[in-house]
């Protein structure tokens, strides 16, 4: 105890001496080149004058003294954050982000690549007016006074504990929360086998609700431990969680004293709380955590798992426990962190405790008298209650937390798996199983799709929305009939946001995918030929070309006319893009007439070869066609037979479109539509006309767009997206002409 007090007194005495020296000398003798741990915590003072009075000046850490209007500009705060905390959070978390970037994206390895050489020469030639020695001393003092506060925070024990927590969690995330025997080792072994699907990722990933639980817990613990330095430490958290654009109002939600998470069954709620509690105990000295659940049997495996993790990571000599009630973790300083367990049948063990974090697992199913004990902790300013639960909205007793949605209380924040905006969409659309805000992804812990939803409904009506999702009941009056399938926000985004594929072609994939849905009719009020040309941009799909072609008359040259239209669209796309595409992969639907499909493919091949020889544009040398075998033969022909893939293709396209992953190029080519209207608006009208038709007691689903309009371009685009994602390259081959 005496040694600890002496150390604190010595530290404070040193800080006073440093402050006195800076005040006396104006920090003029400070080391101008010192950098700590790769960060600019000791960034030198730059003597440049600004033509504003002192009352309108502000100190930007690691930058200098600027006009106070700069304090509200995001660019300066972002630069400050990166310069102060780059070595703490960026090393691990940027590594994760680099691994997650698709290979088609260009990787910038040189920091100077962001500036052109001419801009750098101009910047280096700028000479700033400087203050004289007297004014400079005053500005130095103001600057280093601010920087000293950051140094004081960086050297504090609480901040070091926070950085240790971030570092350890990043290592766990890289290793998918397994195979980490010693968290403080610099080498982290990868998992040899991942039980859950990894979706081609080299590291572990978090569901969005798991990241939010982590953010809520970390922000609140930071505000409690760091006290006056909490606001400065939030800059570090914005770097660590990759949320640079979060405002102070948004981050205030993470410091609220009560947060409710309503998440579907089997999504990894308790699975995530175990390493989170273990890491918090082993990183923050003296932290007190409470954990309660609805029954004793649910607490026992959590108790054992947390204890096993701590013993495996740090050794059994630092872990002590009272069977089923308390786990204690000892630090070299002599301080201890504890976690206390209690079921809703006996909450006496948590009464009178002084928790910093109180996790209430399966909160919707705990006893009412236990809720009263838990709510009593709201009166403790240093305690945050985190309710995590699934919801059975069919009963009032198991969905009382759901009634808290929409609360404007400053103490309470409610997070649901499906937001209010998209709840109606999930309720109406029988194949939707997740919120569009969650990018309609399939969670790692349980694959939820339309088949699972329909199976649950067969056992018990409304069981999917009530028990698995929680928070909605299917209205049987609207189960029959038509319903729209594309969200308004996705339609608006498709109309407004159109990236240019001509100005910057490097990030895009080298291959183009074409789907042709031929129609042999001269009636413009009936179906026409739909053509869609798409490419890939990472996980997104970009529409390069769109055609809706109607024959002038039914003649023997109809197939050649359709093939010429497709070739014209392709050559114009190649002409406006300076970089040559790799392979053009074409699928021509042959359901209506297989002979005509072969003739269309032949005409396209002939036209593309002629364009290639004429060198009118950087035409790809490889034009391949999807081939199918004819019945009873081994001969393959260049056409695509659309059979049962249509519903699957539409389901996939709907998920991608509502997730914002289908985009239209700003330089979209159309020789048939653009003469009369904007091709994107033309396509959008057909998209809004598509509806899902549900019939019969089993709610059989079909898609229709013929009512009041055409759907040819939508079908072509849907199938183009489908073949680009699901058809292997070996199914395409060139044809000889």
From Swiss-Prot:
The protein's Enzyme Commission number: 3.1.-.-
Enzyme superclass (EC): hydrolase
Hydrolase listed as a keyword: yes
A GO term, aspect molecular function: DNA binding
Keyword list, A-Z: DNA-binding, Host nucleus, Hydrolase, Viral genome packaging, Viral release from host cell
Pfam family, one: DNA_pack_N
Subunit note: Interacts with the terminase subunits TRM1 and TRM2. Interacts with portal protein.
Function: Component of the molecular motor that translocates viral genomic DNA in empty capsid during DNA packaging. Forms a tripartite terminase complex together with TRM1 and TRM2 in the host cytoplasm. Once the complex reaches the host nucleus, it interacts with the capsid portal vertex. This portal forms a ring in which genomic DNA is translocated into the capsid. TRM3 carries an RNase H-like nuclease activity that plays an important role for the cleavage of concatemeric viral DNA into unit length genomes.
Protein name, UniProt field: Tripartite terminase subunit 3
Organism in which the protein naturally occurs: Gallid herpesvirus 2 (strain Chicken/Md5/ATCC VR-987)
């Amino acid at each position: 105890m005496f040694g600890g007090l002496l150390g604190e007194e010595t530290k404070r005495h040193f800080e006073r001496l440093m402050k006195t020296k800076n005040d006396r000398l104006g920090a003029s003798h400070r080391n101008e080149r010192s950098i700590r741990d790769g960060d600019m915590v000791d960034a030198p003072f730059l003597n440049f004058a600004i033509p504003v009075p002192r009352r309108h000046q502000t100190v930007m850490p690691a930058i200098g003294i600027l006009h106070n209007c700069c304090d509200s500009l995001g660019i300066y705060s972002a630069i400050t954050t990166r310069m102060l905390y780059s070595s703490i959070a960026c090393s691990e978390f940027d590594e994760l982000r680099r691994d997650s970037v698709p290979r088609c994206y260009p990787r910038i390895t040189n920091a100077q690549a962001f500036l052109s050489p001419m801009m750098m020469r101009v910047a280096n030639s700028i000479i700033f007016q400087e203050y004289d020695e007297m004014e400079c001393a005053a500005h130095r003092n103001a600057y280093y006074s601010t920087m000293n506060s950051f140094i004081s925070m960086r050297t504090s024990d609480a901040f070091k504990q926070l950085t240790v927590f971030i570092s350890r969690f990043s290592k766990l995330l890289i290793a998918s929360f397994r195979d980490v025997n010693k968290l403080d080792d610099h080498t982290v072994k990868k998992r040899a086998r991942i039980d859950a699907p990894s979706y081609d990722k080299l590291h572990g990933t978090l569901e969005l609700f798991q990241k939010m639980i982590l953010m809520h817990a970390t922000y609140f613990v930071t505000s409690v431990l760091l006290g006056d330095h909490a606001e400065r430490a939030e800059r570090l958290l914005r770097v660590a969680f990759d949320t640079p654009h979060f405002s102070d109002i948004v981050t205030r939600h993470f410091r609220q004293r009560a947060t409710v998470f309503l998440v579907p069954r089997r999504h990894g709620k308790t699975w995530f709380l175990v390493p989170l509690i273990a890491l918090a105990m082993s990183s923050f000295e003296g932290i007190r955590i409470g954990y309660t659940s609805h029954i004793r049997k649910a607490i026992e495996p959590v108790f054992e798992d947390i204890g096993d993790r701590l013993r495996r990571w740090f050794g059994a000599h630092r872990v002590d426990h009272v069977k089923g009630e308390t786990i204690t973790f000892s630090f070299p300083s002599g301080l201890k962190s504890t976690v206390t367990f209690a079921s809703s049948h006996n909450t006496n063990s948590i009464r009178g405790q002084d928790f910093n974090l109180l996790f209430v697992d399966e909160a919707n199913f705990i006893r009412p008298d236990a809720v009263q004990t838990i709510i009593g902790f709201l009166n403790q300013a240093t305690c945050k209650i985190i309710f995590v639960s699934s919801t059975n909205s069919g009963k009032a007793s198991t969905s009382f937390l759901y009634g808290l949605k929409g609360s404007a209380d400053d103490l309470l924040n409610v997070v649901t798996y499906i937001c209010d905006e998209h709840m109606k969409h999930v309720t109406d659309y029988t194949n939707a199983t997740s919120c569009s805000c969650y990018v309609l992804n399939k969670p790692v812990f349980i694959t939820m799709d339309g088949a699972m939803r329909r199976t649950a409904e067969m056992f018990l009506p409304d069981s999917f929305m009530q028990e698995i999702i929680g928070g909605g009941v299917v209205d049987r009056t609207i189960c029959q009939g038509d319903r729209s399938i594309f969200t308004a926000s996705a339609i608006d985004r498709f109309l407004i946001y159109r990236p240019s594929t001509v100005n910057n072609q490097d990030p895009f994939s080298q291959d183009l995918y074409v789907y042709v849905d031929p129609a042999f009719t001269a009636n413009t009020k009936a179906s026409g030929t739909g053509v869609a040309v798409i490419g890939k941009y990472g996980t997104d799909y970009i529409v390069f070309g769109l055609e809706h072609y109607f024959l002038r008359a039914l003649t023997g040259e109809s197939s050649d006319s359709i093939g010429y239209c497709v070739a014209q669209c392709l050559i114009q796309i190649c002409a406006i893009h300076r970089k040559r595409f790799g392979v053009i992969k074409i699928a021509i639907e042959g359901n209506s007439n297989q002979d005509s499909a072969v003739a269309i493919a032949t005409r396209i091949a002939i036209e593309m070869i002629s364009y290639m020889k004429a060198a009118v544009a950087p035409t790809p040398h490889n034009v391949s066609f999807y081939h199918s075998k004819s019945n009873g033969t081994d001969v393959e022909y260049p056409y695509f037979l659309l059979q049962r893939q249509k519903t699957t293709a539409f389901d996939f396209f709907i998920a991608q479109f509502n997730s914002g992953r289908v985009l239209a190029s700003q330089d979209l080519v159309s020789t048939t539509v653009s003469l009369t209207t904007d091709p994107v608006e033309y396509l959008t009208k057909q998209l809004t006309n598509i509806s899902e038709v549900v019939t019969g007691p089993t709610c059989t689903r079909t898609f229709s767009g013929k009512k009041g309009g055409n759907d040819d371009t939508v079908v072509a685009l849907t199938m183009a997206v489908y073949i680009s994602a699901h058809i292997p390259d070996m199914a395409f081959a060139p044809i000889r002409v």
